[in-house]
Amino acid sequence: MASANHVRVIPHMFGTAIRMAATLQLLANLPDVPHSNVPFPALLEYDMSENALRTELAKDPVTHKDGVVTIPQGPGLGLEINRELLSKYAA
């Protein structure tokens, strides 16, 4: 709907490494808007507070450098889960 109306989508993410990876995969698949030869860069707003489920849940967590993040590669969302940390939070 946003693309059909030439509206830019900027996802907001708050939560775990899994949500971060899913949001990045979504962002990577959004079309460029506005439709031009010089599209706006993709933007993502996300929480930077301390959160072990975002920074330690994935064995290779998403990090940013100079305002840029790398989209995880690999099967599914591209994450390998830190099962030791996960078991710490399991009920």
Go through each PLM region and give its residues.
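Shared catalytic-loop signature of beta/alpha-barrel
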Residues: 1-68
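C-terminal extensions of enzymes
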Residues: 51-91
